[in-house]
């Protein structure tokens, strides 16, 4: 049974989701949001970094999936998102987690069966797959979806003798 951390990065709100892959599916462990407030960017990045490290220390995942940066209309927003993502990746790398990156389309495809699913459809599938009775916060739901995508990807790679750890720098680029 593998504990998997999913991260939905953001410079103001970073969602996290932890699931246990039992080999027969995933079980919900925890989820939530790291809220950075409205301080200076370097202060917010430090909060993301510390928050992700705290989640790792609390739950003990061995692997992490994180969403790739998409190209936003606003270049400044995309850069800030990339920096928050970097803070989360460094936190995972410092704790020796296996790290894999997924596009939003890959996550939606793995969880909802279509890369064009909307946030509500993804949330409903997350609730169904993890047997949740209450809706998680949207950023936490996205992070749980990333964790589920990572679990699915790992389970399809392992029987073929592949591992997410074999890639350059411990990060699997799909």
From Swiss-Prot:
An annotated Gene Ontology molecular function: crossover junction DNA endonuclease activity
Annotated residues for binding of Mg(2+) 1: 8, 139
Chief location of this protein within or outside the cell: cytoplasm
Domain of life: Bacteria
Keyword DNA damage applies: yes
Pfam families noted in UniProt: RuvC
Keyword flag Manganese: no
Span of the signal peptide: none
Cofactor binding note from Swiss-Prot or TrEMBL: Binds 2 Mg(2+) ion per subunit.
Stored SUPFAM superfamilies: Ribonuclease H-like (SSF53098)
Positions of Mg(2+) 2 binding: 67
Cofactor(s) required for function per UniProt: Mg(2+)
Location relative to the cell: Cytoplasm
Quaternary structure and interacting proteins, as annotated: Homodimer which binds Holliday junction (HJ) DNA. The HJ becomes 2-fold symmetrical on binding to RuvC with unstacked arms; it has a different conformation from HJ DNA in complex with RuvA. In the full resolvosome a probable DNA-RuvA(4)-RuvB(12)-RuvC(2) complex forms which resolves the HJ.
NCBIfam families, A to Z: ruvC (TIGR00228)
Recorded family membership: Belongs to the RuvC family.
Record-given protein name: Crossover junction endodeoxyribonuclease RuvC
Organism: Pseudomonas savastanoi pv. phaseolicola (strain 1448A / Race 6)
